[in-house]
Amino acid sequence: MNAPEILNGAATASPADATEATQTAARAKTPLTRREQKEAYENNKLFKRLARQVGEAIVDFNMIENGDKVMVCLSGGKDSYAMLEILMRLRERAPINFDIVAVNLDQKQPGFPEHVLPEYLKQLDIPFHIENQDTYSIVKRLVPEGKTTCSLCSRLRRGILYRVAGELGATKIALGHHRDDILQTLLLNMFYGGKLKGMPPKLQSDDGKNIVIRPLAYVKETDLEKYAELREFPIIPCNLCGSQPNLKRAEMKALVRDWEKRFPGRIENMFNALSNVVPSHLMDHKLFPFAGLRATGEADPQGDIAFDEEPCSTDAAEGAMPGATKSISIVQFDDL
């Protein structure tokens, strides 16, 4: 996509006409109270921020191209609802043509409200497909009682969605993972997997046949929570299967939330670090040729300053005011 055009579209888009209070007042031709005006302003600002961030992610990673058919995976949770609505709004103003089809996988979990998503999608007047597959029975049969079923369930779901994408002729599969999901995955892999690995905004599927995109990659979960409350999405609970929660991921989520609250700027810096990788200062010899490294006798502006204190830019440092900079010593001579 063309960056200026789609981002301009994001800036001018607005939610389904802000809040109920705004709509009611407009119909009645009565002036808004100061509180209602403030709420309408904040809600509109929230949508513009979400649309801008989604537009930026699409542009930065070339997620959607002219002629694409994007299969939006709709689970019934706040993230996928918001993703679908924002993509629909951006499409109205995008400089390219692309189609959207919403897909939900009904896994036959007990108590799953089968009517909710079809009714909602019919109101949106958007093409959709409900795939009925009883993966619930398979998972319950194979996973011991009390164990987390999420891993097997996700593998089954992934295979089904890849197949459905092929049947529908989808060229991109859109998932609703957001910024916090990406950081939680990074921490999980570091703490429990021994890998410096996150969750990419765009990837080729493991079967080699699909391109998976995450348009919400730049979006904070707290913003999605506010937006879902504003839009009153018909949220479907994610615990219908009765599985035990993923305690490790819950731990990472709590950690990220705590850091963001207590140390303003820390989480944003962590997220920015994913886009500013320096392989020569890590330890993966597959990414950098340490074995063949030799002194050339010529100055290298990118060379290491091993005996100096390395300054950190802290424009968004913990507790710092925007625009402030401060040098933080991260290498002490006692450590050398």
Swiss-Prot record:
EC id: 2.8.1.-
Domain of life: Bacteria
Cofactor(s) annotated in UniProt: Mg(2+); [4Fe-4S] cluster
Pathway the protein acts in: tRNA modification
Motif (PP-loop motif): 75-80
Gene Ontology biological process terms, A to Z: tRNA thio-modification
Gene Ontology cellular-component annotations: cytoplasm
Family affiliation: Belongs to the TtcA family.
Official protein name in the record: tRNA-cytidine(32) 2-sulfurtransferase
Native organism: Paraburkholderia phytofirmans (strain DSM 17436 / LMG 22146 / PsJN)
